[in-house]
């Protein structure tokens, strides 16, 4: 086992659930509007353009005001949000083909949801698909997902909603199109040229409250740079009606001030991914857990230790196994993270779709390797140095 890894729990949310009557007698708490949600985060988006500057704060806001063409659902299966069906080899909507230069490629058929419209009433069509592709593949725009757009060799448009992507390669994840971030051609095409200046001219920065930029259950109605973003229900949203009549995402960069605002009732919730670290959340829960609900959700990011395989002491796999059995990782998690940090038994997170549950697990069992070291040598025995000298005695650890 090469890596000793710990999943990095991303605290998704510290949610305010206490009624105003249980809070200290403060005007903000007493006057709380149940139709308004104020969320505290610790960073302000550098842009709201979906294809520039990948950052959590931007994704947090855009998730309320936009929808991707496809996403992974809770069962790690690709599903449509803005399309009517996924391309499939068995159904003929995905096909193997040769690229113009004779390499293996694929053709993928998609159809946009005919109900989908931008927030100003303009239908979302294949014109937006073509414009988005032009922006994404242009060498001077510098979009985040330029590799995806370059993989698309051409696009066949069949009508306002149906189109076919011709890809330069074949892949097992061909159904997904999550990084193809649709842009409103009727608004952004007018500011695209010259492409090198598009990042400075986009309406997502110059006029972010323009309803035609958004097509989610909410739309951005006000931006106070560096301070807050206000979202309100999109009256043209074709899906389930959103619950809150207004959501305010407020930026408070100092985490101590963020917590103080929550305690004062000035904000209702702290987003974990862009708010508090896990140790700060644990400290908050210890002091105020009776009045607030803290939700912990592990993320897919792993913090881990890589073993230096060139080190002669660690070059033998049996030594590494022995070391793993000698580390009480559960105790470490309990001491440092109150048990909120799940243990990793390999390089793949259990939440991942490709996780294999039957892979070997090296649980804490210091006696097991110690039985092999009947003749420890040196002052480090029976630790790693002695193990390296006597590992041959162990046929199986």
What is the meaning of each model-derived region?
Residues 40-100, 213-215:
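N-terminal lobe/hinge region of extracytoplasmic solute-binding protein
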């Amino acid at each position: 086992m090469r890596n000793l890894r710990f999943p990095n729990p991303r605290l998704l949310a510290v949610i305010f659930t206490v009624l105003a009557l249980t809070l200290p007698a403060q005007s903000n708490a007493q006057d709380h509007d149940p139709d308004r949600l104020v969320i505290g985060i610790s960073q302000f988006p550098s842009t709201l353009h979906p294809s520039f500057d990948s950052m959590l704060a931007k994704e947090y806001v855009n998730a309320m005001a936009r929808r991707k063409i496809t996403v992974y659902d809770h069962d790690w299966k690709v599903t449509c949000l803005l399309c009517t069906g996924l391309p499939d080899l068995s159904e003929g909507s995905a096909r193997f083909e040769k690229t113009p230069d004779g390499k293996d490629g694929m053709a993928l058929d998609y159809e946009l949801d005919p109900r989908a419209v931008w927030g100003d009433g303009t239908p979302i069509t294949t014109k937006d698909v073509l414009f988005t592709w032009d922006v994404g593949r242009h060498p001077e725009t510098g979009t985040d997902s330029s590799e995806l757009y370059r993989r698309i060799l051409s696009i066949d448009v069949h009508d306002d909603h149906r189109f076919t992507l011709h890809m330069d390669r074949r892949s097992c994840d061909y159904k997904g199109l999550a990084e193809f971030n649709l842009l409103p051609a009727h608004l952004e095409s007018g500011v695209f040229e010259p492409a090198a200046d598009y990042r400075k001219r986009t309406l997502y920065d110059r006029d972010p409250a323009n309803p035609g930029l958004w097509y989610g259950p909410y739309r951005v109605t006000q931006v106070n740079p560096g301070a807050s973003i206000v979202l309100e229900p999109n009256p043209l949203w074709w899906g389930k009606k959103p619950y809150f009549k207004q959501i305010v995402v407020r930026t408070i960069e100092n985490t101590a001030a963020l917590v103080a605002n929550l305690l004062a009732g000035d904000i209702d919730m702290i987003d974990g991914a862009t708010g508090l670290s896990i140790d700060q959340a644990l400290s908050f829960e210890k002091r105020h857990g009776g009045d607030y609900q803290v939700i912990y959700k592990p993320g897919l990011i792993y913090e881990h230790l890589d073993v230096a395989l060139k080190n002669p002491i660690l070059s033998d796999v049996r030594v590494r196994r022995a070391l793993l059995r000698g580390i009480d990782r559960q105790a470490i998690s309990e001491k440092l993270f109150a048990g909120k940090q799940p243990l990793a038994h390999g390089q793949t997170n259990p939440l991942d779709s490709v996780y294999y549950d039957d892979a070997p697990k090296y649980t804490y069992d210091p006696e097991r390797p110690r039985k092999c070291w009947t003749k420890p040598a040196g002052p480090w025995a029976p630790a790693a140095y002695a193990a390296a000298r006597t590992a041959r005695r162990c046929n199986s650890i």
